[in-house]
């Protein structure tokens, strides 16, 4: 199917889905939406998954959902990116960055900021020289869009949409606090809004806002040390945008007509229009600046340069390059070492795995502990563990009471590679990050 047969604006997409729903069953509409997403390299996640016949790339429907209905009714869908943004994309596909739709009415529930472009092209340099962009410092945090939803089973509440999830209210990243609890905690500290947190075993954690307009969705950024464990950069919450779900008009905190969450500050002030090469040079030293600040005990966000956002003043002209993300080396390191989701880990194990994996990677080890000195005791524990494993491998103790499986696996890898089993070889092998999950299974003994 050619790209021309698909809509190119959000309004047209919604209109197309609504028209199709009038003339077909919901499963056929969802199947068309899957085709749309596949064509433009997007991902779709459903509240209750529908699988088009003959396709095997989506997960199977759980048995309990198929006993009474072979095609479960979908309540919500979220459209997100499957790959980085390209220059020639339409404004619609840039908006599929955590776009949540009501699959009953095919209206918007949550409209996030557009996906950013992440390269500096000649076209971007041209627009920048001609003053098309505002420059905004990046704040290291998590982007969430708050929207109202009347759940058919559990009743109404305000939900938290992320880039890939229609509601992460009950999701934990590090530790046992859910996103709803983290947002509530930050709102209590930094806002004046009237919000309550509900905790129920059957429904989990939910937020209730008593003074927000249900016809709007509210995009915020949050920085909490359960999500961003660089504790020298303080926790915070800030406003990014609100969208009128009836008109689909988005307004930013700095503009007239903004309807926000009471007491939450706007993102950050606009910076002067420096020359682009100077702007890029200015964040090249971000890693050393951050490490020096931490070494000297400085707890202030001013010491942490994550890069800059170029935000277009004329998105109708700049189109898919209306938001440009310029990451500093500090942010790149944090994304690779901490934020990228690795393996299917529980929230109780994620922090341990992150620290362990960084310890095992020689090119990450020193920078990680310089940014996160609170974890130095973990490094000592890992060194003790690896010393024991190295000794056990050297004597081929595959029957070790708790590390036998680890010893056997590493020994097999060394022998299969036809390497000589000496101290240097063993040491090189046990420090490989590919064994992190294996080590995680015995870490409680240290």
Swiss-Prot record:
Its main location: virion. Keywords: Early protein, Virion. GO terms for cellular component: virion component. Induction: Expressed in the early phase of the viral replicative cycle. It is found in: Virion. Belongs to the asfivirus M448R family. This is Putative RNA-ligase. It comes from African swine fever virus (isolate Tick/Malawi/Lil 20-1/1983).
């Amino acid at each position: 199917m050619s790209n021309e047969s698909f809509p190119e604006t959000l309004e047209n997409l919604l209109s197309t889905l609504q028209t199709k729903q009038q003339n077909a069953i919901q499963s056929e509409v969802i199947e068309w939406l899957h085709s749309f997403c596949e064509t433009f390299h997007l991902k779709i996640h459903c509240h209750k998954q529908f699988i088009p016949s003959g396709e095997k790339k989506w997960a199977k429907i759980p048995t309990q959902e198929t006993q009474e209905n072979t095609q479960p009714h979908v309540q919500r869908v979220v459209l997100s990116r499957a790959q980085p943004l390209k220059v020639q994309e339409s404004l619609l596909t840039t908006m599929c960055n955590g776009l949540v739709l009501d699959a009953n009415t095919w209206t918007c529930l949550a409209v996030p900021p557009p996906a950013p472009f992440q390269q500096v092209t000649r076209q971007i340099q041209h627009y920048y020289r001609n003053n098309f962009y505002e420059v905004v410092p990046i704040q290291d945090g998590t982007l969430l869009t708050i929207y109202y939803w009347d759940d058919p089973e559990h009743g109404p509440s305000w939900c938290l949409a992320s880039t890939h999830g229609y509601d992460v209210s009950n999701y934990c990243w590090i530790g046992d606090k859910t996103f709803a609890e983290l947002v509530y905690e930050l709102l209590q500290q930094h806002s004046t809004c009237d919000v309550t947190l509900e905790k129920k075993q059957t429904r989990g954690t939910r937020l209730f806002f008593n003074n927000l307009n249900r016809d709007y969705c509210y995009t915020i950024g949050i920085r909490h040390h359960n999500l961003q464990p660089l504790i020298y950069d303080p926790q915070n919450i800030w406003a990014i945008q609100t969208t009128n779900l009836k008109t689909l008009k988005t307004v930013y905190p700095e503009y007239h007509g903004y309807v926000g969450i009471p007491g939450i500050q706007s993102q950050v002030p606009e910076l002067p229009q420096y020359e682009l090469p100077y702007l890029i040079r200015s964040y090249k030293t971000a890693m050393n600046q951050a490490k020096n600040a931490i070494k000297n005990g400085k707890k202030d966000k001013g010491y942490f340069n994550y890069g800059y956002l170029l935000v277009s003043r004329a998105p109708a002209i700049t189109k898919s390059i209306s938001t440009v993300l310029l990451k500093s080396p500090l942010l790149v390191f944090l994304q690779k070492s901490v934020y990228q989701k690795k393996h299917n880990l529980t929230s109780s194990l994620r922090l341990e795995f992150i620290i362990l994996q960084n310890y095992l990677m020689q090119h990450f080890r020193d920078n990680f502990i310089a940014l996160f000195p609170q974890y130095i005791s973990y490094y000592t524990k890992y060194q003790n563990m690896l010393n024991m494993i190295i000794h056990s491998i050297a004597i081929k103790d595959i029957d070790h009471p708790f590390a036998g499986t680890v010893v056997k696996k590493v020994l097999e890898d060394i022998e299969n590679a036809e390497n000589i089993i000496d101290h240097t070889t063993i040491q090189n092998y046990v420090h490989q990050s590919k064994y992190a999950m294996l080590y995680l299974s015995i870490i409680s003994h240290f």
